């Protein structure tokens, strides 16, 4: 399997808080996997807005091995917003595929607080139902960070969010990075070192969850 060596992330603070791409690069390096990352991110930015920016297409045209797209959760709470999200996604996906990139949806984690009346676990289902059909239709891969969070919520008592209860805390961030790793490389997250100062015992739990989602294909709300 040909692994991506340079990766572009397009999204918002769900990508840059705790620097998920940078931590992925660091943990990969420790495993002898050399990758680089570039981020086009801005707080609160929606994919439909990214899709209106010429600079985004100029960066996509450079031909990254992989491009990850990450949405604002608020952008898919109504049918109108969901349609706008998909329209923006499709434009950027088509541009990235034309440039020879493998496209991925970074299916984001839920918020720790309610979103449009949905609790965190149910947000995971909403995000899944938004992106999975489009991914299947457009030949896009998915990194199901939402499913990893759903599994953690369902089966464990793990502090996943930071003080604002919206962005990931260190354990949520590590869970996301482990899920990226297992999804992209098809390798077990248990081979990764811990990070963010997380104790090894806690890291092992998060690694196992990532493997269940990325390697075993578990969908928490169907089990």
Tell where the protein language model's regions lie, with residue ranges.
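Alpha-helical cap/lid subdomain in secreted, periplasmic
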Residues: 58-170, 182, 189-193
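Conserved catalytic region of serine esterases and O-acyltransferases that act on ester linkages
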Residues: 167, 178-223
């Amino acid at each position: 399997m040909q692994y991506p060596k340079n990766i572009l992330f397009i999204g918002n603070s769900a990508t840059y808080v705790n620097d998920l791409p940078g931590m992925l690069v660091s943990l990969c390096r420790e495993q002898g996997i050399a990758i680089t990352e570039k981020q086009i991110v801005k707080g609160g930015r929606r994919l439909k807005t990214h899709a209106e920016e010429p600079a985004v297409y100029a960066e996509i045209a450079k031909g990254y091995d992989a491009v990850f797209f990450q949405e604002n959760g608020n952008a898919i709470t109504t049918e109108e917003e969901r349609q706008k999200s998909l329209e923006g996604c499709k434009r950027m996906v088509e541009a990235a595929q034309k440039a020879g990139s493998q496209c991925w949806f970074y299916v984001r984690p839920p918020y720790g607080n309610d979103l449009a009346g949905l609790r965190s676990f149910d947000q995971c289902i909403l995000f899944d139902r938004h992106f999975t059909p489009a991914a299947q239709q457009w030949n896009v891969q998915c990194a199901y960070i939402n499913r990893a969070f759903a599994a953690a919520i369902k089966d464990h008592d793990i502090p996943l969010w930071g003080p604002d209860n919206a962005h990931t805390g260190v354990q949520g961030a590590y869970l996301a990075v482990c899920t990226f790793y297992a999804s992209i490389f098809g390798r077990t997250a248990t081979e990764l070192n811990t990070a963010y100062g997380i104790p090894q015992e806690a890291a092992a739990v998060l690694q196992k969850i990532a493997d269940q989602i990325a390697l075993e294909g578990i969908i928490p709300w169907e089990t």
